[in-house]
């Protein structure tokens, strides 16, 4: 019998089911949906449009603070060229993330998305993690929901899931105290989902996390 798991059932499986049993069940479900001979994948590309950031995560060697001589922000043309290279190998999606850059006005993000949507109409644009959305909202003095609405109107397809390691408050306080509270990350994702934007969750591991 096919049915969706309830929230309680999902939590129970996550908390108590042996991993090998979950893996086996997932394989059986995939085979039932697509057949055992079919495996799907897509080709995408990560684009880091800026390394300017004010969050200063302890584990990040990528960011540079504003004013540092190694900072960069890519031009629209540079970003478009990276997408052209993706299209040449039949890629279908970008995941574009960067730092929380206080020097970029909200219009920069809107104009970038509009330009990319015109230049690359078939590419899914998954852009700006919840942490970046919070930063954009702060600079623009808009709510995160208003930011998401306008970015969707400009052509954004979904959000990458960066920053999910911060959902554990003790971890956040230890390695990235300037990031927003876990509730903020969840709120942005819930707002995105309410607008029909795709979302995911990705996290850096190795901070002593447990199930």
Q: What residue ranges belong to the model's regions?
A:
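Auxiliary Fe-S-binding modules of radical SAM enzymes
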Residues: 1-20, 24, 28, 81, ...
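Residue-level preference for alpha-helix termini and adjacent loops
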Residues: 4, 38-40, 46-52, 58, ...
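Small/polar loops that bind or transfer phosphate-bearing groups
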Residues: 14, 45, 163
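Short capping/connector residues at structural and topological boundaries
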Residues: 18, 52-54, 58, 176, ...
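N-terminal pre-triad scaffold of radical SAM enzymes
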Residues: 23-66, 71-97
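Conserved Radical SAM active-site core
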Residues: 64-211
